[in-house]
Amino acid sequence: MISQTSTPVIVCGAAGKMGREVIKTVANASDMTLLGAIECQPEYIGQDIGELIGSGPLEVPILNDLQGILVMAAQEKQPAVMVDFTHPDSVYENVRSAIAYGVRPVVGTTGLSQEQIQDLAEFAEKASIGTLIIPNFSIGMVLLQQAAIAASKHFDHVEIIELHHNQKADAPSGTAIKTAQMLSELGKTYNVPNVEETEKIEGARGCLAEEGIRIHSVRLPGLIAHQEVIFGGPGQIYTLRHDTTDRSCYMPGVLLAIRKVQSLTKLIYGLEKIL
């Protein structure tokens, strides 16, 4: 059994780049204990997750059995947390299963539809289980979004460019969608056209998000995660940019989310809501 003062943590997507970083962080946190490492890639199954991340044995085998780990978690005296960095195709069922077993989900996987998020919110509230869906765990990105909100009061034209590694499955990124949503909630319409635009190639102007905001997605090897919010006005351009140079920048936000979700009784969307 895990110490009554230590939070049991399950990591889904444990062998992925973000999953490995989360494993290292949880293993080094004095108030957390790694309960399970879930991965669907067959070449990793059965390995000790500590050996995989290069930190030495942690005595936690990599499994492809979330259900079994959730059953174990439900038996712990201290409420468990599941951190999910998997794939848009699997995250919804993972989160529903965790809530059903009383395990608090912290979700970094993007690609959930608004309908899925709403369904999970209703399910979590009915079960009184804290759930966090966070498109971006970087404190710097939260500051960028806050600066964008401030700038939007003075500019009527804005576009978002998000750039990620070419292994990212969804586009646009959850962070870009979240940024556009935050700007759209300010009660104004952006980018009112001065001319009738024609796209010679479909998608050349990016995707049209809420309130006229356009989002452009770039996928290239060599990138990690980057975002620009570009405002334009007569005689000036104002550019906000955040660059992730190492995934370790997300870990303070992940730790905060794991600790915070335990006191919640409903779903919350966005890191800025718990800072």
From Swiss-Prot:
Q: What family does the Swiss-Prot or TrEMBL record give for this protein?
A: Belongs to the DapB family.
Native organism is: Trichodesmium erythraeum (strain IMS101)
Positions of the catalytic residues: 164, 168
Name of this protein: 4-hydroxy-tetrahydrodipicolinate reductase
Q: List the GO molecular function terms.
A: 4-hydroxy-tetrahydrodipicolinate reductase; NAD binding; NADP binding; oxidoreductase activity, acting on CH or CH2 groups, NAD or NADP as acceptor
Q: So where does (S)-2,3,4,5-tetrahydrodipicolinate get bound? A: 165, 174-175
- Reaction(s) catalysed (UniProt annotation): (S)-2,3,4,5-tetrahydrodipicolinate + NAD(+) + H2O = (2S,4S)-4-hydroxy-2,3,4,5-tetrahydrodipicolinate + NADH + H(+); (S)-2,3,4,5-tetrahydrodipicolinate + NADP(+) + H2O = (2S,4S)-4-hydroxy-2,3,4,5-tetrahydrodipicolinate + NADPH + H(+)
Location, primary (coarse class) = cytoplasm
Offer one example of a GO biological process linked to this entry. Answer: lysine biosynthetic process via diaminopimelate
Q: Which gene encodes it?
A: dapB
Is Translocase a UniProt keyword of this protein?
no
What InterPro entries does the record tag this protein with? Answer: DapB_C (IPR022663), DapB_N (IPR000846), DapB_N_CS (IPR022664), DHDPR_bac (IPR023940), NAD(P)-bd_dom_sf (IPR036291)
